[in-house]
UniProtKB/Swiss-Prot annotation:
Its EC number is 2.1.1.177. It is found in: Cytoplasm. Belongs to the RNA methyltransferase RlmH family. Keywords: Cytoplasm, Methyltransferase, rRNA processing, S-adenosyl-L-methionine, Transferase. S-adenosyl-L-methionine binds at L52, G83, L102, S103, S104, L105, T106, L107. Disulfide bonds: none annotated. It comes from the Bacteria. It is an enzyme of class 2 (transferase). The gene is rlmH. This is Ribosomal RNA large subunit methyltransferase H. InterPro entries: Alpha/beta_knot_MTases, RlmH-like, tRNA_m1G_MTases_N. It comes from Polynucleobacter necessarius subsp. necessarius (strain STIR1). GO terms for molecular function: rRNA (pseudouridine-N3-)-methyltransferase activity. It catalyses: pseudouridine(1915) in 23S rRNA + S-adenosyl-L-methionine = N(3)-methylpseudouridine(1915) in 23S rRNA + S-adenosyl-L-homocysteine + H(+).
Length: 135
């Protein structure tokens, strides 16, 4: 199972680079529709797509861990999409298998990246029985 995070944005502060590894940089000076073309091209073939949007479905860390276990067992690769300042183009949301939100708050996309990576790590530690996550 591979997890891919596709995100748009300007050069991130150093703390973002410390928390994440940039897989592919997408230029931020494009319109929403042009961003959608670039984002769609960055999605690995056959990958299930989860769009992150402030109006998406709430998730819990435990639910994420359960979902990761299911995807791993089924052999699915997953791509998480994080939009720029204007969010994601509607075409990306309609083609996504799910739309999730990380918070009821509106988050800057740099913070959303870090939060997503931390939650993926936390969910993974739950599956491994590691004591990082505490109820």
């Amino acid at each position: 199972m591979r997890l891919t995070i596709v995100s748009v944005g300007h050069k991130m502060p150093d703390w973002v680079a410390t928390a994440t590894i940039e897989i592919k940089e997408i230029k931020p000076d494009l319109t929403l529709a042009k961003e959608a073309v670039k984002i769609a091209a960055a999605i690995p073939k056959g990958s299930r797509v989860i769009a992150l949007d402030e109006r998406g479905k709430d998730q819990t860390t435990q639910n994420l861990a359960t979902q990761l276990a299911s995807w791993r067992q089924e052999g699915f690769d997953i791509t998480f999409l994080i939009g720029g300042a204007d969010g994601l183009d509607p075409s990306l949301k309609t083609t996504a298998q799910a739309i999730w939100r990380l918070s009821s708050l509106t988050l800057p996309h740099a913070m959303a990246r870090v939060l997503l990576v931390e939650q993926l790590y936390r969910a993974w530690t739950i599956l491994q029985g590691h004591p990082y996550h505490r109820e």
